[in-house]
């Protein structure tokens, strides 16, 4: 997911997206531990997406813009 796509969402949607990404990361880590993960790069992608969402949430909080 690109940062420009994330910026279009409001804080409520971003928090929902963050929860979904965290649960996906949990599932991927579980698959990695049980040697069922086919694509290890997926972990990196999900972690970066979580960081992007958190960064944009913080930007919106600091700017006072809840859109």
UniProtKB/Swiss-Prot annotation:
Claim: tRNA processing is one of the keywords in the record: no
Task: Give me any GO biological process, just one.
Answer: translation
The yes or no answer to whether the keyword Ribosomal protein is present is yes
- Write down any Gene Ontology CC term: cytosolic large ribosomal subunit
Signal peptide range equals none
A GO molecular function held by the record: structural constituent of ribosome
**Top-level taxonomic group:** Bacteria
Keyword vocabulary terms for this entry: Ribonucleoprotein, Ribosomal protein
**Membership in a protein family:** Belongs to the universal ribosomal protein uL29 family.
Question: Do you know which PANTHER family this protein is assigned to?
Answer: 60S RIBOSOMAL PROTEIN L35/50S RIBOSOMAL PROTEIN L29 (PTHR10916), LARGE RIBOSOMAL SUBUNIT PROTEIN UL29C (PTHR10916:SF0)
Protein name, please?
Large ribosomal subunit protein uL29
Q: Which organism is it from?
A: Ruminiclostridium cellulolyticum (strain ATCC 35319 / DSM 5812 / JCM 6584 / H10)
Give the encoding gene's name: rpmC
